[in-house]
Amino acid sequence: TRDYSYNYGGRKYFVTSEGSAWKYFYDSSNGQYSPQFDVVGPVTVSREMSYYGKNVNSFDANPWIMVKEACQLVDDSIDFTKYDNNNDGYVDFIYVIYAGYGEADGGDKNTIWPHSYWLMEAGVNCEVDGKYVDLYACGNELDYHSKQHTGIGTFCHEFSHVLGLPDLYETTGN
């Protein structure tokens, strides 16, 4: 039997189902990696998407503020200390799925481009439960073209970055 994961929109989803992110990482690692995903939320952040996603010098303006707010909003619901596996004072990483479309698949210039980054690199300090959140990734909920859930592609891509994996395609624009 499959482990029950969550119920969304009246439909049950299973972590280990064929086509799941878990299955992708498990199969890609020949059974060496079996990730655990804890789903929390949804929460509503304080500003409109354009505050976080508007383009400034070809980059999103404030996605890190969205990530910090999301962490603060779920702080009472979860114990962030359990996500610091090496006890170095930092949450290993988090992944935020934001509502709506992403700029990478056709959303307008005020939406967020899915990415991975570090809060501290952006000058943002986020401490929850005595641990710092730094490394994160985020991606959109809906695909602009199909108007359906995005599936696992972008999630797996950005999640791979927080695991330390590089892009395997040209990233310099040449």
Summary of predicted features, one role per range:
Residues 1-174:
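Active-site-proximal segment of zinc-dependent metalloprotease catalytic domains
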